[in-house]
A protein has these predicted regions:
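Short hydrophobic beta-strand element within catalytic cores of glycosyltransferases
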Residues: 217-220
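Conserved acidic donor-binding segment of nucleotide-sugar-dependent glycosyltransferases
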Residues: 232, 236-243, 252-258
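A charged, aromatic-enriched C-terminal amphipathic alpha-helix characteristic of glycosyltransferases
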Residues: 259-290
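Membrane-proximal helix-turn-helix segments that form the acceptor-binding/catalytic region
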Residues: 10, 26-72, 81, 85-87, ...
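Nucleotide-activated donor-binding/catalytic signature segment of Leloir-type glycosyltransferases, i.e.
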Residues: 160-186
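Aromatic "clamp/platform" in nucleotide-sugar-dependent glycosyltransferases that forms part
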Residues: 200
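Conserved donor-binding/catalytic core segment of Leloir-type glycosyltransferases
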Residues: 73, 119-137, 143-146
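Short alpha-helical donor nucleotide-sugar binding micro-motif in glycosyltransferases
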Residues: 187-192
């Protein structure tokens, strides 16, 4: 038996890990007329590679469908739907979410030091976290959001910013370079009043769940897998790219207060997304896969 966990869309496309930002659905029928060709912002410098995508996808389809006892695991219902709509949609799919270590990510009480370290003061702290900030991750949307909220009341903190990006971000946004220190990251989540994802394409949204584990509500865009994570007890979902609605949602969370959401956020992280729960689901799947099939 083969269990293949998908964290992005590469397996079902001619080579793209994501396609939503480029508004492409060609992967459903063969990856012809690739919109990435010639677009330097999304990899057009490799347009020769992208022109081979139809051939690559045909090869993937042949190889994947030839495996007799294959099961895909996807990290969200959204990604599961993508697989089922693809050229390898006949392969069985099971959803097992990414997991969070709730013994490392938990509400911290010593948050004033981290607020002072980054100069947040007592302002409402809006946090976004990414390992790679780009246009499709919503970087410029944070710039726009900053202009819609009074700087003396709200502060935007972006974690994972490169040193080059840090030198170029607008006034009123605090850039924090990537940290491998989970305790510091948990402190930032705990200090935040809201954790956000303004990404245009996510197969899961682990930073949101890490924020939940630290008792922090979320505001996310209504695309791909993000809406699966958030309900009215844990935050708000807004129309992708609608900056007025986004600012309104931030103000609503501010008015309601973080404490209204915190317990539900922590419970969701522990009961639905704890990593040990996900391990158990994998063990169960492996055991099922090893049961001899009846002829």
């Amino acid at each position: 038996p083969v269990i293949w966990t998908l964290h992005d869309c590469w397996a079902v496309t001619g080579g793209c890990t994501h396609f939503v930002y480029n508004k492409c659905e060609n992967w459903k029928t063969g990856c012809y007329r690739c919109p990435r060709c010639g677009n330097s912002d999304t990899g057009g410098e490799l347009k020769g590679v992208f022109r081979t995508m139809p051939w690559v996808l045909r090869k993937k389809e042949a190889y994947i469908t030839s495996v007799p006892n294959l099961t895909f695991v996807t990290v969200s219902e959204w990604l599961s739907g993508v697989v089922r709509s693809s050229v390898v949609g006949s392969v069985p799919v099971q959803v097992i979410s990414n997991g969070v270590d709730s013994t490392r990510f938990y509400p911290r009480t010593d948050i004033q030091a981290i607020k002072q370290k980054y100069g947040c003061g007592n302002r409402f702290m809006i946090v976004g976290v990414s390992s790679h900030w780009s246009v499709s991750k919503g970087l410029y949307d944070y710039y726009k959001l900053r202009e819609l909220l009074p700087a003396d009341q709200f502060v935007v903190v972006l974690v994972g910013i490169t040193s080059e990006q840090k030198n170029n971000i607008p006034d009123g946004i605090i850039g924090v370079e990537r940290t491998e220190n989970l305790d510091e990251l948990a402190l930032i989540y705990s200090a935040a009043d809201v954790v956000t994802s303004l990404s245009y394409q996510e197969t899961f949204g682990l930073t949101i769940v890490e924020g939940f584990a630290c008792g922090t509500p979320a505001v996310v865009y209504d695309n791909t897998a993000l809406p699966e994570l958030v309900d009215s007890d844990t935050g708000l979902v807004v129309e992708t790219g609608n900056m007025e609605r986004l600012a309104e949602a931030i103000r609503q969370v501010c008015k309601t207060g973080k404490s209204f959401y915190s317990q539900a956020c922590r419970e969701v992280a522990q009961t639905r997304y704890d990593k040990f729960c996900q391990y158990e689901k994998y063990v169960e799947l492996y055991e099922q896969a090893l049961v001899p099939k009846k002829v």
